[in-house]
Design a protein with these regions (language model features):
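AMP-binding/adenylate-forming catalytic core of the ANL superfamily
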Residues: 37, 146, 151-152, 162, ...
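Conserved ATP/PPi-binding loop(s) of AMP-dependent carboxylate-activating enzymes
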Residues: 100, 118-121, 132-163, 198-200
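Active-site glycine-centered loops adjacent to acidic/histidine catalytic or metal-binding residues
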Residues: 70, 94, 117, 146, ...
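Conserved coil-to-alpha-helix start sites within the AMP-binding
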Residues: 1-9
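Residue-level recognition of short loop/turn positions
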Residues: 128-132, 139, 166, 179-180, ...
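Hydrophobic alpha-helical segments, especially N-terminal targeting/anchoring helices
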Residues: 67, 127-128, 136, 171, ...
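Gly/Ser/Thr-rich phosphate-binding loop
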Residues: 9-12, 26, 34-39, 48-111, ...
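ATP-dependent adenylate-forming carboxylate-activation enzymes
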Residues: 12-32, 41-45, 200-205
Length: 225
């Protein structure tokens, strides 16, 4: 939502294609010369893979930064995008219920690749299964409170009551905050794999697989057997 409203408030133009297509993306990059673009992690990977097919457009791009906000971005993709386009990649966390939870600041402020930045408004905390807030470097559910949090789900009081508890929106995401308030996402509660009583995060498996030079993409998920 903020990708649409903020530029309008600043008097800027917006290019919003109906569907994502690589060719259209690079054509728009050349035609409209945007100063930034926002996309999900899968789109960023596709853009990076195709950049070599559009060398002139990439060389003459007008970007000031690249924004990513739908999930944790592979560090290799971050390095690739920054090397290819010559601008910083700014990661953040947002969702329909809370449009912008956190974001890494623009340079020269401190940016921590692998994190989704610091809270922009309200409160972002980590909570355990008992509803207790945890301190820095402790893993738990990411919860958010503030004016940017939605009021509830339309005609679904049960879902609203489950998501909003004592003013805190329970995101369903697992994460931790460091000593400086930078947030790292480690997975989703519902995606935890229970193997012999041990809780395994799919993200950890995916990160390990992605360390291999022959692996381009990886996805881990539970499978009954």
């Amino acid at each position: 939502e903020q990708a649409l409203t903020v530029p309008l408030l600043a008097g800027s133009g917006i290019v919003c294609p109906p569907v994502f297509e690589i060719r259209t993306f690079f054509e728009n990059l050349a035609r409209f010369r945007p100063t930034w673009y926002s996309a999900g992690f899968s789109h960023h990977s596709a853009i990076l893979d195709a950049a070599g097919d559009y060398p002139k457009i990439v060389e003459n791009n007008n970007l000031r930064y690249i924004r990513s906000g739908s999930g944790r971005l592979d560090p290799r993709v971050i390095v690739g995008l920054e090397t290819t386009f010559g601008v910083p990649v700014i990661e953040g966390l947002g969702m329909s219920e809370v449009p912008c939870v956190t974001c890494n600041p623009l340079p020269p402020a401190k940016r921590k690749p692998g994190t989704v930045g610091i809270a922009l408004d309200g409160n972002v905390e980590i909570m355990d299964d008992r509803g207790q807030l945890l301190g820095p470097n402790s893993e738990g559910q990411i919860v958010v409170r503030g004016s940017m949090v939605f009021e509830g789900y339309l005609e679904d009081p049960a879902a609203t009551a489950a998501a909003l508890v004592d003013g805190w929106y329970h995101t369903g995401d697992l994460g931790c905050l460091d000593d400086e308030g930078y947030l790292t996402i480690v997975g989703r509660i519902k995606e935890l794999i229970n193997r012999g009583g041990e809780k395994i995060r799919p993200g950890e498996v995916e990160v390990a697989l992605m360390q291999h030079s022959d692996v381009k993409e990886a996805a881990a998920f539970p499978f009954p057997h």
